[in-house]
C-alpha cells in the first residue's frame, strides 16, 4: 500500500545519501549501491515514484469506482476513521454529492512506528485488554473498513438498504493542554456533546457508547472520565460501554471505522457485544455502576418504544483530535417522519464554495534547496514557542514552519478558540520520518552493505563504520520522536500552541491539497460549526519521491490564512483581503463549456478584491 511503500522508499533514499557521504568516489561506491539496490530497492521511474506518495492511497479506490472529482486522504491520527466520516458528511449537507465513500485503512505496521510508540510506553507486552483495570497498553493491528454515505431522503426515495442513520458527527480539538499526545477530557467531551447536539439528544437518549479505549492506562482513564461527564444524571439506567480492540487490536487510522461497523452489526443483531479479555473492569466502571454497564457476555440490546436504538461512537488521536459520531438503527417509519420534519434544514445546493480571507501568515526556510534528507537546517524560535531545544530536532521542519507562519497570522487577528478550526492541505510524508526510519532501521542498511560482493571485508567494514557515524548524528528515538514525524501533528501543533478547539486535520490531495483544504473549511463555516478557519499548507520535504510526484517544486515554506464565511464578509467588507471560490475541475468545465486535461482536482478563483473605501466587489478577477 502507498504509506508502506513510501516508508520503504524514503529509507532506501536516505541510505543512499548516507553512502554518498561515506564514499564520495563514484567508482568505489558502485558495488555498495548494487547491494542496496538488491536489499532496499527504490523506484526509478517518475510515474512509479509518484504512486508511492501517501496521497496515492485514495486514487486506486476512486479509479476503481469511476469517481472523477475528489479523492482525498484525511489525517487525524487515530481519530481518522471517524474524522473521515465527519468530513464526508460535509459533502452531503450541501447536496454537492449524492454519495460519499469514507474509508479507514491501516496496512503499514512498520518497525519505525512500533519502536517510536514503545518509547511513550504505549505498547502492551502481553495482550490487548481495553477497559480492564490491569490493561498494560495497546497491540497494533491492521485492517480496513468502508461506509457508503448518502442523504437519508435520497436513500428512502430510492428504496436503498440502510444500515444506520447518522444523527450527528463532530470533530473537536483539545486546544492548549499537556503533551501533544496526552488525552484531554475537554476535547473528548466537546466532541461527544457536539455529535449529540446534531439530534438535540440528552444523556438518556444514548443507549451505548463505543469507546476509543485502546488499553493504555492514561487513555482509558481519561475517556471514562469524559463518558462519565456525558452520562452523569441519566435516569434510564447505566449506559452500555464497548471496545472492539481486544478482537481487532488497534488499527490506528482504521480504528474508528472498526468501531462504527461493530455498532452497526450490534444494531442489526439487536445485541450488545461483549468486551473480551476483561478480568477486572476498570475501577471507574466498578465505582460507578449507576453510570456504566460493561458487558462481558453477549446481552440483548433493549428496544425503546419511542425511538430507535442509538449509540455514540468515539475515535481519538494524537494532536488532540477527537471525533464522535451519533448513530441510530434505521426505522423506516421513524426516519421517514424525520426526513419530513428536517427537509427544510438542509443547506441549499451550491456549486462553488467561497471563503473570505481576513489575514495571512507566511514563513520560508532560510535555506531553500541546500542539503538533503540527512540535514536539519530550518531555524526555529524555540524560546517563543517554549519548546526545549533538545526536542527541536524531533520536530519536522513543516511543523516548525507552520508554527511560525501561524504566529505571524495571529499577530494580525484574534481568534475565538471554541469557534475556530484548522484544515491544512499538504502532501503527507514528513522529512524527519526519513531520518527516524534510517536511525531505527540502520541494521537493515548495514546488513545490505555487508552483503556487497567482490570487495575486501576490511573495506566493507570501513564503509559500514562511515554510514554508522552519519547515523549517529541523528538524535536517538525518544518520547517526543513519534509526534515529531506524524503528518497530522502539523495541524495539531497549531491547535495546541494557539488553543484552537474546533476541528483539526490535514488533507492530502496531492497538488490539489491546498484547494481541498479551502473546500472543506468552507463547508464547516457554511454549516455554522465554526466562525473562523485556519487553512493553508506547510511543506519541507526534499525527498525525491515528492519531487517525482511534482510536489516539491515550490521550496520549503508554510503559508496560512484565516478565513471566514461569505455571509460574514458581506457584513464586514472593510476587513476582507480577498474572497476566493473553490470548484472542482468538472464544475468549471460544465460552467464554461470547455474540457480540461485534468480529470480530477480543484480550481481556485479570486472572486473579490478590496475596492478602496467602498468595500469589496464581487467581480471575478
Each model region followed by its residue ranges:
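Condensing-enzyme catalytic core of the thiolase-fold
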Residues: 1-621
Amino acid at each position: 500500500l502507498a504509506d508502506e511503500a513510501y516508508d520503504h522508499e524514503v529509507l532506501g533514499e536516505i541510505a543512499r545519501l548516507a553512502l554518498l557521504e561515506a564514499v564520495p568516489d563514484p567508482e568505489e561506491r558502485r558495488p555498495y549501491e548494487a547491494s542496496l539496490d538488491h536489499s532496499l530497492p527504490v523506484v526509478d521511474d517518475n510515474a512509479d515514484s509518484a504512486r508511492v506518495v501517501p496521497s496515492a492511497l485514495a486514487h486506486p479506490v476512486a479509479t476503481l469506482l469511476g469517481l472523477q472529482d475528489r479523492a482525498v486522504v484525511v489525517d487525524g491520527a487515530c481519530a481518522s476513521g471517524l474524522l473521515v466520516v465527519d468530513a464526508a458528511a460535509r459533502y452531503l449537507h450541501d447536496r454537492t454529492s449524492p454519495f460519499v465513500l469514507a474509508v479507514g485503512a491501516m496496512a503499514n505496521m512498520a518497525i519505525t512506528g512500533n519502536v517510536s510508540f514503545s518509547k511513550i510506553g504505549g505498547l502492551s507486552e502481553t495482550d490487548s485488554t481495553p477497559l480492564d483495570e490491569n490493561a498494560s497498553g495497546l497491540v497494533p493491528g491492521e485492517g480496513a473498513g468502508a461506509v457508503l454515505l448518502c442523504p437519508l431522503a435520497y436513500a428512502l426515495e430510492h428504496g436503498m438498504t440502510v444500515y444506520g442513520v447518522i444523527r450527528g458527527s463532530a470533530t473537536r480539538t483539545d486546544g492548549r493542554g499537556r503533551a501533544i499526545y496526552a488525552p484531554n477530557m475537554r476535547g473528548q467531551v466537546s466532541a461527544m456533546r457536539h455529535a449529540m447536539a446534531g439530534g438535540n439528544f440528552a444523556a438518556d437518549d444514548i443507549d451505548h457508547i463505543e469507546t476509543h479505549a485502546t488499553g493504555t492506562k492514561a487513555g482509558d482513564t481519561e475517556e471514562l472520565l469524559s463518558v462519565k461527564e456525558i452520562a452523569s444524571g441519566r435516569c434510564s439506567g447505566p449506559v452500555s460501554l464497548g471496545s472492539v480492540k481486544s478482537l481487532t487490536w488497534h488499527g490506528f487510522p482504521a480504528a474508528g471505522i472498526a468501531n462504527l461497523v461493530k455498532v452497526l452489526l450490534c444494531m442489526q443483531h439487536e445485541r450488545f457485544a461483549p468486551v473480551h479479555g476483561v478480568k477486572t473492569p476498570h475501577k471507574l466502571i466498578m465505582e460507578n455502576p449507576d453510570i456504566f454497564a460493561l458487558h462481558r457476555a453477549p446481552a440483548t440490546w433493549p428496544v425503546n418504544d419511542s425511538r430507535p436504538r442509538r449509540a455514540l461512537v468515539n475515535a481519538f488521536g494524537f494532536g488532540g483530535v477527537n471525533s464522535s459520531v451519533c448513530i441510530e438503527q434505521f426505522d423506516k417509519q421513524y426516519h421517514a417522519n424525520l426526513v419530513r420534519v428536517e427537509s427544510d434544514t438542509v443547506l441549499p445546493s451550491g456549486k462553488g464554495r467561497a471563503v473570505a480571507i481576513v489575514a495571512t501568515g507566511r514563513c520560508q526556510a532560510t535555506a531553500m534547496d541546500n542539503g538533503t534528507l540527512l540535514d536539519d537546517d530550518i531555524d526555529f524560535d524555540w524560546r517563543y514557542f517554549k519548546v526545549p531545544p533538545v526536542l527541536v530536532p524531533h520536530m519536522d521542519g513543516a511543523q516548525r514552519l507552520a508554527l511560525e507562519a501561524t504566529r505571524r497570522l495571529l499577530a494580525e487577528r484574534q481568534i475565538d478558540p471554541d469557534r475556530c478550526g484548522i484544515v491544512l492541505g499538504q502532501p503527507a510524508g514528513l522529512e524527519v520520518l526519513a531520518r527516524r526510519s534510517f536511525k531505527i532501521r540502520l541494521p537493515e542498511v548495514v546488513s545490505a552493505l555487508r552483503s556487497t560482493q567482490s570487495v575486501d571485508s576490511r573495506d566493507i567494514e570501513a564503509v559500514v563504520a562511515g554510514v554508522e557515524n552519519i547515523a549517529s548524528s541523528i538524535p536517538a528515538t525518544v518520547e517526543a520522536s513519534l509526534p515529531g514525524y506524524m503528518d497530522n501533528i502539523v495541524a495539531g501543533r497549531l491547535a495546541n500552541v494557539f488553543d484552537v478547539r474546533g476541528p483539526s486535520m490535514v488533507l492530502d490531495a496531492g497538488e490539489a491539497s491546498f484547494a481541498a483544504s479551502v473546500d472543506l473549511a468552507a463547508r464547516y463555516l457554511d454549516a455554522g460549526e465554526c466562525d473562523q478557519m485556519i487553512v493553508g499548507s506547510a511543506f519541507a520535504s526534499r525527498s525525491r519521491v515528492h519531487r517525482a510526484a511534482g510536489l516539491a517544486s515550490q521550496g520549503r515554506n508554510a503559508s496560512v490564512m484565516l478565513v471566514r464565511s461569505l455571509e460574514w464578509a458581506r457584513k464586514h467588507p472593510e476587513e476582507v483581503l480577498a474572497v476566493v471560490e473553490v470548484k472542482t475541475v468538472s464544475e468549471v468545465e460544465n460552467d464554461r463549456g470547455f474540457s480540461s486535461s485534468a480529470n480530477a482536482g480543484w480550481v481556485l478563483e479570486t472572486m473579490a478584491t478590496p475596492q478602496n473605501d467602498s468595500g469589496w466587489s464581487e467581480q471575478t478577477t
